[in-house]
Amino acid sequence: MVSLSILDQSPVSEGSNAETALQQTVALAQAAEDLGYKRFWVSEHHFSKRLAGSSPEVLISHIAAKTKRIRVGSGGVMLPHYSAYKVAENFRVLEGLTPGRIDLGLGRAPGGMPIASWALNDGGKRNADQYPQQIKELTMYLHDLADDKHRFPNLTAAPHISTAPDVWLLGSSGESALLAAESGAGYMFAHFINGEGGEGTVRQYKRRFKPSVLGDTPRAAVAVFVLCADTEEKAEELGAVLDFTLLAGEQGIPLEGVPSYEAVRKNTYSPYEQRRIADNRNRMIVGTKEQVKERLLALSNAYETEEIMVVTITHHFEDKLRSYRLLQEAFAD
């Protein structure tokens, strides 16, 4: 049976503001819990007017306090910006506050423009090459494994708690899959970023998986854009907005927020742009609840996974809520 989860990037709608976007993320998490979604993850983006979620740890804490059962996590913390020790302590605090409900999703992407990376590293170089070593150290801190031979002998992360957050690595390449496998972590493939070749990447993760304190068996899931509506016409209107938003991002066109369908419906595109839009449709599933369910089940079969994480970006928050309600209805039938 397929389980459904949500990744929300706190998108700001054109004409709205970041405060509203963050409040809508919290409201969506509460609705997701009521609807029966398994996880609710929030993202990390910097120096962005369009995406308000810059500090997943803070947002997770608030969402966890406003919900009761749903797992809450990061999708993800961009670890190369930070000290593995500090991340371990942040997530131990979260786990201590809500035991058994916290997921620590990790990534190596910058999550923003180079100037933001420089600022996050106080003008120093962001060294993503150290990411595998950071994963090892983070694991030690989360599970009290730093002994007297560690570079910080016998260092433990506070608070000292009896449980640990579930660790997931996020990625869209074979390199990230191999690192997740070698670490014993869960692996979330970002189909919404890379719509091609993910099936083989997930199979590679499962083949190369090594049990560790992070997990005894492989845990694989796939994240994909989904836009679900009552009619095909409405779904395609939502799709047209996401088409434009993704294309604008590729072309470096600054957006004040996610536009409305009325703002993009008369757009014309060059042959090259039309090809890019068609290619980007491989990253998303658009349609009625019956159509979306059929394609999500096919995606689940292709990836050989029973968990799908859904990313939905719309101008109107009501359209997003409706999409998630219809999706859950489809899988309840």
From Swiss-Prot:
Gene3D superfamilies tied to this protein: Luciferase-like domain
* Gene Ontology CC terms: cytosol
Q: Give one GO molecular function term.
A: oxidoreductase activity, acting on paired donors, with incorporation or reduction of molecular oxygen
What domain of life is recorded for the organism?
A: Bacteria
InterPro entries on file: Bact_Lucif_Oxidored, CmoO-like, Luciferase-like_dom, Luciferase-like_sf
NCBIfam families attached to this UniProt entry: oxido_grp_1
Its family?
Answer: To bacterial alkanal monooxygenase alpha and beta chains.
Q: What is this protein called?
A: Uncharacterized protein YwcH
